[in-house]
């Protein structure tokens, strides 16, 4: 990583929205990646104003999205899927149809599993096997740490101007532990 990229990451303002235990994981990964300006918002607060940040990382869990306005900054939605994790990015100008989904975590898990099955993507079997646990709203600490790591990597790439996959494309990984 160049000094300029390190500066861009340090100067980038990130807002994390979600459950406190998950926020702690994301915050730690963002700090490890070099982010300095991190704003924390409890997931219980429905947000109408984003404020002055450069991107948002919102952990939804089994609920609905807190940000209800059309935003002009990237939004990263990390998900813990018990045996692994995934993330979806909404970039400015993208249609954020995710705003209208109930139980977004389950919807995304089924979407990703269906995509992998349809396109015969190797290495996704763990997600299909995790769907019953996801339907029961089970989580795991390892999956939350993996989701936080994925989120921080995406945030760093956005901060330095690299292209990232955005919805309908996604990121998916087995647990790192």
Model-found features: residue ranges?
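N-terminal charged helix/coil linker that caps or initiates catalytic domains
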Residues: 1-15, 32-33, 45, 169-170
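Cofactor-binding loop segments of dinucleotide-utilizing enzymes, especially the Rossmann-like FAD-
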Residues: 19, 42-43, 80
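Hydrophobic/small residue at the entry helix of a nucleotide-binding pocket
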Residues: 22
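Rossmann-fold NAD(P)-dependent oxidoreductase module
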Residues: 25-33
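NAD(P)-binding Rossmann-fold cofactor-contacting core
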Residues: 36-47
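E1/E1-like adenylate-forming module used to activate ubiquitin-like modifiers
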Residues: 50-146, 173-176
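Oxidoreductase and adenylate-handling cofactor-binding alpha/beta cores
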Residues: 149-165
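A short, charged, Gly/Pro-tolerant segment at domain boundaries
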Residues: 161-177
């Amino acid at each position: 990583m160049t000094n300029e990229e390190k500066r861009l990451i340090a100067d980038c303002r990130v807002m994390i929205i979600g459950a406190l235990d998950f926020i702690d994981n994301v915050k730690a990964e963002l700090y490890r990646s070099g982010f300095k300006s991190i704003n924390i918002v409890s997931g219980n607060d429905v947000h109408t104003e984003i404020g002055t940040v450069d991107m948002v990382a919102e952990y939804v869990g089994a609920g609905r999205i807190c940000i209800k306005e059309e935003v002009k900054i990237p939004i990263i939605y990390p998900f813990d899927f018990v045996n692994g994790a995934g993330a979806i990015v909404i970039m400015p100008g993208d249609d954020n149809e995710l705003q209208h989904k109930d139980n977004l975590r389950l919807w995304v898990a089924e979407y990703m599993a269906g995509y992998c099955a349809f396109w015969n993507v190797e290495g996704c079997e763990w997600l299909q096997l995790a769907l019953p646990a996801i339907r029961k709203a089970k989580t795991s600490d390892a999956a939350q740490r993996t989701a936080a790591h994925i989120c921080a990597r995406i945030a760093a790439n956005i901060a330095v101007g690299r292209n990232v996959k955005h919805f309908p494309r996604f990121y998916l990984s087995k647990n790192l532990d």
